[in-house]
């Protein structure tokens, strides 16, 4: 997973979007931010967010925390997003990238309630989840997906747990139809389920994908929304 977070075009595109939002928030606030990366994985996003303030990484998996610590992230916490408190009004920004969908998150509202309590008033939540159950396939089996979401479902959950949604949009618009076809093929192949993120791409193709995603990110960062995609991204305030 560490290699994927560092080199895969999908992670590069996602992290570029998050950094855009956090950079703008740091400029708005005018001081270093207290940032939590909830579900930090191996810590690549934590590393990228360090220039904007004090970063804390939390994850339920001890191996993920060990990998994050190896990157030089000092503040790491083992945390169950449903069962464990994150404290009250501790953070200016919380990122939660592809965590809420996981089968280990047995109560979405409890998880979002924990994130809401941990944010300071006016604080920013950046969250992403996989989109559309019709895209469910071998990748979802490999990464323990409990469910996929429509945009309106994520918006409703955020509002029900006290957030003010500032942006909610699908991401990776051109990938929707290819992903749907790919899911159908990989459902039928009968092989061992594999995450799409372990599949390699030619370097030239990966670079083209990153160029497109960064252009899309520029649109999302100024409030443009997309009608379809393979993920749902939202920015919300407490």
Predicted regions and their residues:
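Short N-terminal helix/helix-N-cap motif within the alpha/beta-hydrolase-1
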Residues: 47, 104-108, 137
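A short glycine-rich, Lys/Arg-flanked "PGG" loop and its adjoining helix->strand segment in the class I
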Residues: 109-124
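Short, glycine-/aromatic-enriched active-site segment of Class I SAM-dependent methyltransferases
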Residues: 125-147, 153-156
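Conserved N-terminal segment of class I S-adenosyl-L-methionine
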Residues: 1-89, 93-97, 112, 219, ...
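Short catalytic micro-motifs in class I SAM-dependent methyltransferases
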Residues: 98-102
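Conserved S-adenosyl-L-methionine
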Residues: 163-173
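A C-terminal cap/extension of S-adenosyl-L-methionine-dependent methyltransferases
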Residues: 175-238
């Amino acid at each position: 997973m560490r290699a994927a977070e560092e080199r895969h075009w999908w992670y590069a595109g996602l992290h570029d979007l998050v950094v855009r939002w956090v950079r703008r928030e740091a400029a708005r606030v005018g001081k270093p931010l207290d940032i939590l990366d909830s579900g930090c994985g191996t810590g690549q996003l934590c590393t990228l967010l360090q220039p904007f303030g004090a970063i804390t990484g939390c994850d339920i998996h001890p191996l993920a925390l060990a990998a994050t610590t190896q990157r030089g992230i000092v503040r790491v916490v083992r945390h169950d997003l449903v069962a464990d408190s994150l404290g009250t009004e501790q953070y200016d920004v919380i990122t939660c990238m592809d965590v809420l969908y996981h089968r280990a998150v047995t109560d979405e509202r409890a998880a979002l309630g924990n994130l809401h309590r941990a944010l300071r008033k006016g604080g920013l939540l950046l969250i992403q989840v996989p989109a559309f159950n019709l895209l469910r396939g071998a990748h979802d089996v490999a990464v323990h997906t409990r469910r996929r979401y429509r945009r309106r479902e994520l918006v409703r959950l955020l509002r029900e747990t006290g957030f003010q949604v500032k942006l909610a949009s699908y991401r990776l618009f051109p990938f929707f139809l290819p992903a749907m076809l790919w899911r159908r093929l990989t459902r039928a192949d009968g092989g061992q389920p594999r995450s799409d993120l372990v599949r390699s791409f030619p370097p030239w193709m990966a670079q083209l994908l990153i160029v497109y995603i960064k252009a899309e990110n520029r649109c999302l960062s100024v409030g443009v929304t997309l009608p379809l995609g393979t993920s749902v991204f939202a920015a919300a305030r407490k």
